[in-house]
Curated annotation (Swiss-Prot):
Gene designation: pdxH
PANTHER family: PYRIDOXINE-5'-PHOSPHATE OXIDASE, PYRIDOXINE-5-PHOSPHATE OXIDASE
Name of the protein in question: Pyridoxine/pyridoxamine 5'-phosphate oxidase
Catalytic activity annotation: pyridoxamine 5'-phosphate + O2 + H2O = pyridoxal 5'-phosphate + H2O2 + NH4(+); pyridoxine 5'-phosphate + O2 = pyridoxal 5'-phosphate + H2O2
Keywords: Flavoprotein, FMN, Oxidoreductase, Pyridoxine biosynthesis
Pfam families: PNP_phzG_C, PNPOx_N
Length: 211
């Protein structure tokens, strides 16, 4: 297979310093709203990169579920591999690949657990089947078969037949508090536009980076 000639030009337009808002969270909100309006598939899907205690990096796609001035919130099983990595090294990276708009956003920061109250508020908005799945799946653990997973799911359905499904004590959210956010816009002739926001003593500084 020849991969060398697979390429395309980026022609949707550039990004100028004067186009950017002073706060990167506000700027991200603008781009996210534009991605949603443009029909970008799974616009809230983001790659979460973590590093284990031994220095082994791992990546997986998770969904952005809330955004505010603290940072980027996602939810997971606290016994998962990603949670183990975060417990040993809270420094993480997020990546939003909005190919359709010739844009990408990279976030570097620290992942911190959110409160149980905030987790519960979100958990109660999830479909009942998703709540049951949180109980049924021992995330990242080896299992014998899909049949075994479905059997555990049915067992949880039988256990929680009436009323609200309680929040598992091993499931919850993290907020990634950003220290740096990069906005990338594709440009012609590979002369892409890159702007980096860095948090310096509580103030956001913006720099243009070479592509």
């Amino acid at each position: 297979m020849n991969l060398e000639d697979i390429r395309r030009e980026y022609l949707l337009g550039g990004l100028n310093r004067e186009d950017l808002l002073p706060n990167p969270i506000d700027q991200f909100n603008v781009w996210l709203e534009q991605a949603i309006a443009s029909g970008v598939p799974d616009p809230t899907a983001m790659t979460l990169a973590t590093v284990s205690k031994s220095g082994q990096p791992s990546q997986r796609i998770v969904l952005l579920k809330h955004l505010d001035q603290r940072g980027f919130v996602f939810f997971t099983n606290y016994r998962s591999h990603k949670a183990e990595d975060i417990a040993g090294n809270p420094c993480v990276s997020l990546h939003f690949p909005w190919h359709f708009m010739e844009r990408q956003v990279k976030v570097q920061g620290e992942a911190v657990k959110i409160s149980t109250a905030e987790t519960l508020k979100y958990f109660l908005t999830r479909p009942r089947e998703s709540q049951l799945a949180a109980w049924a799946s021992e995330q990242s653990q080896r299992i014998d078969s899909r049949k075994a997973l479905l059997s555990q799911f049915e067992a949880m359905k039988a256990k929680f037949t009436k009323g609200e499904i309680p929040l598992p004590d091993f499931w919850g959210g993290y907020v990634v508090k950003p220290q740096a956010i990069e906005f990338w816009q594709g440009g012609a002739s590979r002369l892409h536009d890159r702007f980096l926001y860095c948090n310096e003593n509580g103030s956001w500084q913006i720099s243009r980076l070479a592509p």
